Amino acid sequence: MNTDPCVHCGFCLPTCASYRVLGTEMDSPRGRIHALKAIEAGELQLDATVAKHFDSCLGCLACVTACPSGVRYDQLIEATRPKLNAPELRTPVERAFRKLLFALLPYPNRLRAALTPLRAYAGTPLQALARRSGLLRLLGPQLEAMEQLLPPLAPEAFREAFPQVVPAQGERRARVGLVLGCVQRLFDPAVNEAAVEVLSANGIEVVIPPSQGCCGAATHHQGELAQTRELATDLMASFAGVGPLDAVLVAASGCGHTLKAYGSILESPSAAGFAGQVADIQQFLAELGLSETFRAHLAPLNHPDGTPASAERPLQVAFHDACHMLHGQGIREQPRQLLAAIPHIQLREAMEAGVCCGSAGIYNLVQPEEAAELGRIKAADLAGTGAELVASANIGCSLQLRRHLGEGDFPQPVLHPIELLQRSWRAGRA
């Protein structure tokens, strides 16, 4: 691991989410790099106490963007994560909880089976009563955090909704594969529905292998290398034999960041070739361009009070920059370009757009207190824009934002930008 470029200037500190809420040098990129140097020199032991300072890192990569010396902290923390999974560095409870998460989250069919009994609970008055009663605290902070993120479960989450090939409407402009994501297809299936509809309406044929599973993002971000490689290999295999594709698209930035890293994860030319085809759906649509037919049918969206947006009263939308999109993939302008195509939308920028919301894969489950504080900070920042709704292009962020925006007096809806395009397109065809 090359820690030499770090000159300990401290430019990373104001951008670091863990340093913001914990306030200690060891919980900052600079402090962790100093610790890595000491470990490498034999001056410091990687024990359970030191490991906690690495575990406090969200992996948001804001420090990489901020660093004037080009320190690849992302590579340093990724190389360190597998070492943190040594049994002696975690308590039995921590190991058991992580084992549960990694046995469920990356496997859509298992997760669907686990969620089935909760369909009569999630999003109902019973759930609201349980939350108000304080009884959920008896579950412990980690299980309580899981419950706090549990959204209403749509019927579409419990069936495979798409054919293997969705044809392009009109002249075909491109042919793409679509990665559905494991958490997204269950907790927010409307996003994938919108993605398929918007792509097809723009003359893009969509291929959706029914056998596809998890891309490995959750395990990748936690250093579970063997499981990540297995999941990545299986996902690539599900796209084998589907024919030539112009791109492999994904509508969740956390997944996209991992998919684009398949070359280094699997260390093979075929994986690098697959990764080279991966694009965020917004990145792809912005670069290809919305079709003239699609643009012609985009209509104003409604305000929360039901009245349509207008030039005199535009719909105020705050765009949330997910860390693995902004810092991990360098995507910032493309989502804003797509949203600007909708008539009478006015984008409101958050004051601290580059600061993590606290979701960070499974961070808000394994580090619930720190994640909740970051969630409250981000919710206050977005609410302070005066926006009527929030656009978020990552499922983990969306769940986190809905939880913490919902704690306010005037909670804003959180929707994927592709859902807003779909709604505008439908309104123009009504």
Stretch-by-stretch model annotation:
Residues 1-4:
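Generic start-of-chain signal for non-secretory N-termini
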Residues 7, 11-36, 51, 56-83, ...:
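Iron-sulfur cluster-binding cysteine motifs and their immediate structural context
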Residues 19, 39-43, 262, 326:
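Alpha-helix C-capping/helix-to-loop hinge sites
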Residues 21-24, 41-44, 290:
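Short, flexible helix-adjacent loops and helix caps
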Residues 28, 47, 104-108:
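Polar helix-capping/helix-linker motif
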Residues 37-52, 159-172:
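Active-site-flanking structural segment that lines cofactor/substrate pockets
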Residues 73-430:
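Iron-sulfur cluster-binding electron-transfer modules in prokaryotic oxidoreductases
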